[in-house]
Swiss-Prot record:
Source taxonomy: Bacteria, Pseudomonadati, Pseudomonadota, Alphaproteobacteria, Hyphomicrobiales
Organism, scientific name: Methylobacterium nodulans (strain LMG 21967 / CNCM I-2342 / ORS 2060)
Metabolic or biological pathway, per its Swiss-Prot or TrEMBL entry: Amino-acid biosynthesis; L-leucine biosynthesis; L-leucine from 3-methyl-2-oxobutanoate: step 1/4
Protein's name in the database: 2-isopropylmalate synthase
Domain of life (superkingdom): Bacteria
InterPro entries xrefs: 2-IPM_HCS-like, 2-isopropylmalate_synth_dimer, AIPM/Hcit_synth_CS, Aldolase_TIM, LeuA/HCS_post-cat, LeuA_allosteric_dom_sf, LeuA_bact_synth, PYR_CT
Pfam families: HCS_D2, HMGL-like, LeuA_dimer
Stated family: Belongs to the alpha-IPM synthase/homocitrate synthase family. LeuA type 1 subfamily.
EC number: 2.3.3.13
Gene3D superfamilies: 1.10.238.260, 3.30.160.270, Aldolase class I
Binding site for Mn(2+): 21, 209, 211, 245
Cofactor entry: Mn(2+)
Catalytic activity: 3-methyl-2-oxobutanoate + acetyl-CoA + H2O = (2S)-2-isopropylmalate + CoA + H(+)
Keywords: Amino-acid biosynthesis, Branched-chain amino acid biosynthesis, Cytoplasm, Leucine biosynthesis, Manganese, Metal-binding, Transferase
GO BP term, pick one: L-leucine biosynthetic process
Length: 520
């Protein structure tokens, strides 16, 4: 086995694919710097394998995988590759400088995929497995092979494919529920059957990779572990293709909380889970739903009088895990307009941020401006401020000023000043309401064809002076992006969110994708 082999039968490896499968979620594209920040977070919290991207997809993806491979201290860094020679060579080059690099190659195995996507016979696919796994093993010692659409593949043929992949040097075998079709009993039985029937199964670690189309991704992942898998592929916040992937935080906390019936451990520092969730939400501009398990805003909130009474008497009456175990701290009111740089830096470190000097200075200036406008500055305010600052560091369009005239009579009018690629411009626009006027002013300053698909507002903290956090989703052609903006003024937050979405569209305008998207 490779260096990532489990130290005991009970050890489960965590394979995070937020930067690859997670980023395939429509609108979730991350910048180069955001990918590096997420990878650093994953490495620091104890993720065993980071799937950093799909190197053949674009030069940007290759560069991100290569830089993550160079920087990562502990985690294995994997690059995805189709069962195509050029893909495998590109992935091998991308992870070449990693302390521990992995090539993850995949091919379809189900009858429906072979007939309609691959247009290959079973024997032809076996030959492809033989050649491509051998090529990958010549480049790296750590090779993962995946049977795409494994759960709709006849078990006899699946066993033949797995045996061939291991024979040619695969050290990890992934049997994904690609379309989220399996039930837990079926998934558990598949792993048990393959491991029992494949003669060389003991030479590889088996892996689960579950999609959430029927809401069964977590249940199936746990069932796969019970069936003998010792690696779980997952993403922060469960982002991913279609309905998403199994959420890392849910897998890890399920194993930790129910160790009485699931006697398996991971190497994850669970106290960093909330920080990772917020970082990914900020980078992808995908808000976490309020009732999301483990990391949702309401995950540890209790409104029912009966529940509150029980919590006051003993937290274990209605909490099966503590907020502190996943990094949720009690909100503190220690920051304000009189707080200096040292206190602010200490608070950032407490919240899990590590900023460069320039990033710190920008964040501190925004904090002081916020503190002048807001009586109490909560941890959540600081997190929203810093996350926005990191996400907009390389924007081509920046908001300089906004004035809105609104009321029951007369036109709703917005006057906006922007910095566009270093050039300042001002425009006025009317609208059917103040938000519409703001967005019309942006359109006048930055003409575009994008259509607004989502506009959502919620308060970051409590009180009438709470920061508003606005989410916006824009679609231009086949491309959809989501972005967020935060400010005590809802209209300013709206402008920031819309501009952040436009900046993401501009940043991704030249992004190239492989002819066939990896859809594990």
């Amino acid at each position: 086995m490779t260096e990532t082999a489990a130290s005991s039968a009970e050890r489960v490896l965590i394979f995070d694919t937020t930067l690859r499968d997670g980023e395939q979620c429509p609108g979730a594209t991350m910048t180069f710097e955001e990918k590096l920040a997420v990878a650093e977070m994953l490495d620091g919290m104890g993720v065993d394998i980071i799937e950093a991207g799909f190197p053949i997809a674009s030069n940007g993806d290759f560069d991100a995988v290569a830089e993550i491979a160079r920087r990562t201290k502990t985690s294995v860094v994997a690059g995805l590759a189709r069962a195509i020679s050029a893909d495998i060579a590109r992935a091998g080059e991308a992870v070449r400088l990693a302390k521990r690099g992995r090539i993850h190659t995949f091919v379809s195995t189900s009858p429906i995929h072979l007939a309609h996507q691959m247009r290959k016979s079973e024997e032809e696919v076996l030959e492809i497995i033989q050649k491509t796994v051998a090529q990958a093993r010549d480049l790296v010692e750590d090779v993962e092979w995946s049977a795409m659409d494994a759960t709709r593949t006849p078990i006899d043929y699946l066993c033949r494919c797995v045996e061939m992949a291991i024979k040619m040097g695969a050290t990890t075998i992934n049997l994904p529920d690609t379309v989220g079709y399996a039930t837990p009993d079926e998934y558990r039985a598949m792993f048990r059957s393959v491991r029992e029937r494949v003669p060389n199964a003991d030479r590889a670690i088996f892996s689960v990779h579950c999609h959430n189309d029927l809401g069964l991704a977590i249940a199936n992942s746990l069932a796969g572990i019970e069936g003998g898998a010792r690696q779980v592929e997952c993403t922060i916040n469960g982002i991913g293709e279609r309905a998403g992937n199994a959420a890392l935080e849910e897998v890890v906390m399920a194993l930790r909380t129910r160790a009485d019936v699931l006697p398996y451990t991971t190497g994850i520092d669970t106290t960093q889970i909330m920080r990772a969730s917020k970082l990914v939400a900020a980078a992808t501009h995908f808000p976490v739903q309020y009732n999301k398990a483990v990391v949702g805003r309401n995950a540890f909130a209790h409104e029912s009088g009966i529940h509150q009474d029980g919590m006051l008497k003993n937290q274990s009456t209605y909490e099966i895990m503590t907020p502190e175990s996943v990094g949720v701290q009690k909100t503190s009111l220690v920051m304000g307009k009189h707080s200096g740089r040292a206190a602010f830096r200490s608070k950032l470190e407490e919240l899990g941020y590590r900023l460069s000097d320039n990033q710190f200075q920008d964040a501190f200036e925004r904090f002081k401006a916020l503190a002048d406008r807001k009586k109490n500055v909560y941890d959540e305010d600081i997190e929203a401020l810093v996350d926005e600052n990191l996400a907009t560091a390389h924007d081509r369009i920046r908001l300089l000023s906004l004035t809105v005239i609104a009321g029951t009579r007369g036109p709703q009018r917005a006057t906006m000043r922007l910095d566009i690629d270093g050039r300042q411009a001002t425009e006025e626009a009317d609208g059917n309401g103040p938000v519409d006027a703001v967005f019309n002013a942006i359109h006048a300053l930055v003409p575009h064809e994008a259509k607004l698909e989502l506009y959502d507002v919620h308060a970051v903290t409590e009180g009438t002076d709470a920061q508003a956090e606005v989410s916006v989703r824009l679609r231009q052609g086949e491309r959809s992006v989501t972005a967020r903006g935060a400010d005590p003024d809802t209209l300013v937050a709206s402008a920031k969110a819309y501009l952040a979405a436009l900046n993401k569209l501009l940043a991704g305008a030249n992004r190239l994708h492989a002819q066939h998207a990896a859809a594990e």
